[in-house]
Structures are given as structure tokens and as C-alpha cells.
Amino acid sequence: MRLVNLILLLIALVFFVWVLNELGWDTLGHYLWEVGWYWPLLLLPYGVVNAVVSWAWKHIIINPPAKVTVARLFWLRLGGDALNQLTPTASLGGEPFKAVRLQADGVPLEVASASVVIMKGILFLSLTLYIFTGLALAPVFLPQTAKHMLLLSLAALGLAAVGIAFVALQRRGPCGNSFRFLSRRGWLPHFLRDREGFLEDLDTAMSQFYRQYPARAVMSFLLFFLSWLIHAAEVYVIFWLLGC
């Protein structure tokens, strides 16, 4: 496993250097010079955002082992998000990694997998609230956007509907129902044929979370929303330091 981690680290380093080279070392140096010697402070907001999201994730995992701390989730999320960025999987490539590493830390796989799916759903819902907040403030700070407000609001409502449907679906046994639907029609992939029990347990874990721990769901939602606000502050500070 250490060898695999080292290989992945080297690949990530090569990609990182390539990206910087594409941006242009002179251009990068120019912007860093404009910001000043305290430019490393610009990296802090992302760390704060990741810490808040990890805290929210901790609320989703029921009865985690002692070793599953916010700090541990912080690094797991960084690793998973790195895989999301490096693989063409629509930001889903790192999610199995998070679940498997949680299982290695003592969390049952169905609980770990449920936490990842639930986190995606609640994070998406918090994003829609963040978008609606931006739309509410847009006429005040960007009056020129008023003529597009109807279209933007309809798009935001569409996103909210998708998010609500995704979260509501998690309470209705989507994995088991999909398994039986595919099985009846002979479309069930071979690798899923022995996984019905796990899928049923995954459905149970997701449903129980929403039914038995609504306060945890609300707390994680609020923390996710806070993380989006910190993101906004981060962008504002960067542009302010660059004199934009």
C-alpha cells in the first residue's frame, strides 16, 4: 500500500508541475509578487473549508470508532477529492476510496458507504441554498443581473428539485429496488449478483440515518452551508489582494 501511495504521489507531483508550467512560471510569479510574502495564507481558507466539511461528515457517521476523528476524515476527504480531480469520473472516483478507507478504520462498509452517499446529497442541498442566497443578494450588488433573474431562479429551482429528489430517494431503498428491477429483467451485472445483502444493508443505513438522526442531518447541512460561505470569502479575499 505504501508503494501505491508513493506512485500516486509521484503522478500527482508530475501533474502539478505540468499545470504550473502550462500556467506559466512568469505569470505565477507575477501574481505571487502582487499578493506579497504572505501569499501562503491564501492556502488557509481551503484548509478551513475542508475541516468544516469533515466535521459535517463526522455528524453523518453513526457511532464511529475512536480513530475516526475529524482530523482523519480531513485527510480522507483530501485523498478522495484528489482522486476525483485526477480521474474522469464526474467527481465520483474518490468516493469508493473514502468508503474503503473508513472500513479499514473499523466502520462497517455499509455505514461508510451510506455516509458518503448521504454526504453527497446533503452537500448538494446546501449548495442550492448557497445559490439562492447569491441570487437574493445579486440585485443589491449586481443590479445588471436583474434581467436574467427569472432564468437564474428557474435553474436554481431545478437544481433544488434534483437535490431534494436525491435525498428523498435515499430513504426509499434505492439500491435494493434497483437490484430487484434489474434482476427481474435479466439486466443485472454479474459483479452485483452476490451483493444483494450488502445493498439492502446500505439502504437500511441511509434510511435509518434520516429517520433516527434528523438533528445530525440538519447540523451537517448547516456546516456544509458554512463551508460554501467560507469559499465565497476566500474568493473575495484573493481578488482583493490582487487588486481586482
Place the predicted regions along the sequence by residue.
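Short, membrane-interfacial amphipathic segments enriched in basic
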Residues: 184-202
